[in-house]
Amino acid sequence: MADVKRVYTFGNKEAEGNGKMRELLGGKGANLAEMNLIGIPVPPGFTITTEVCSEYYAHGKDAVIQMLRPEVEKAMKNIEKLTGMKFGDKEMPLLVSVRSGARASMPGMMDTILNLGMNDQAVEAVAKRTGNPRFAWDSYRRFVQMYGDVVLGMKPESKEDHDPFEVIIEEQKHKRGVKNDTDLTTDDLKELVRNFKAAVKKQTGEDFPACPWDQLWGAVCAVFGSWMNDRAILYRKLNNIPAEWGTAVSVQAMVFGNMGENSATGVAFSRDAATGENLFNGEYLINAQGEDVVAGIRTPQQITIEGSKRWAVAQKVSEEERKAKFPSLEEVMPEVYKELDEIQHHLEQYFKDMQDIEFTIQDGKLWMLQCRNGKRTGAAMVKIAMDMLREGLIDEKTAVLRCEPAKLDELLHPVFDKKAIASAQVITKGLPASPGAATGPVVFFAEDAEKTLEKTGQRAILVRIETSPEDLKGMLDAAGCLLYTSDAADDRISV
């Protein structure tokens, strides 16, 4: 067992793995390696193989850590060499992200942790090095919140409960009289960190871990543990994904979209995932981190000018207001946008399929965090396959195989009668994230959607401020979902 390679490094346009190693590195790890090999800017890191996930369930946490320690320490030194920073250092601390990556895409089903390595010493060092204490403390509070949720189990226990960290944030915003997280000051964020840690101590009886290595092992094992959480099991069952596949874990040097107005994070699609139109599109948020976009907590701005104008028309926002308050990335950072557009085109041509990409802009520099074949509606599936056949990207056999029989059912979904819509009183409008029309009684909790179907045989309309992965069962039992803050980039909508 000692001779088995469990960790594969990547960075600086080199990688030990490649895109054909999905079974071992998972989809995310394989594509991170492949993007390095074709010259795409990717933060350095390493991937722990799917085989270790099986070992985790066979031998337990302590045995897996013991087996992994030498390879992980060596791989971390490689990141340190490429970044000039050191994991656990008090002067130049290296912060990392920890993400899951099964061989089949499971959007939103498993867990991610950002800014790992943060502690009371690291936050001061980051503040000093960047000259941006607000950014440092914002990154620290995000880390405590994510780690508390994913690793320490600080989650709502019932439908009446609220996320304990969000409650603390809302109380702080109310106290300060502000609406958005970005309006909180450095001192506010320091207070949030103190209150978060106090909440962790109260609920778990333990202090929040300060040692970066303890944090890392806790996060890695939590990702392996998330492979068997209820929502992941349900998703695998629905999509015929074997439990034996396991998940890989990718650890990467952090790049920061929350460093200020010249930083951003976003998700994009090389073609329209709803219609299949050959139109680059996506969303971004200035001064934010990746989870802010895919979690659907804040409504992002559009990447392209064309997309931004379409959004403004749908939202009845004037062109003047759009340009002033909701400009596209193409307008705000034209050079970065141009590079992003070139990369998405390169990736689609290389992988010969519509790409779903995640990116971060740190102080004006673009970094790619992920690419994968994008989820799409049934109508988009057919159009993309036929368009790519005509473009010579794929052959006829591939085009036919791209059309999943189960997805073709979407083309038969009910739609609203045009005459009825014309005469109806419209209460509100939003962005469609999936095809078809739906009717049913309104419920406000996922478990109520489950109970409605169970007791009455009728599917309800699930109305939420935003969804979380825990809502998956209720979403599947509902006729439709109406969300207040989510958008088409929300991972939960695409499942």
Regions found by a protein language model. Give the residues of each.
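Long alpha-helical scaffolds
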Residues: 266, 449, 488-489
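Single conserved hydrophobic/aromatic residue that forms the stacking wall/gate
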Residues: 484-495
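Nucleotide/phosphate-binding sheet-loop regions of phosphoryl- and nucleotidyl-transfer enzymes
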Residues: 1-424, 458-461, 466-470, 477-479
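Extended, non-globular alpha-helical segments
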Residues: 432-470
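HINT superfamily self-processing domains
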Residues: 473-476, 486
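Proteolytic maturation boundary segments
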Residues: 414-415, 419-443
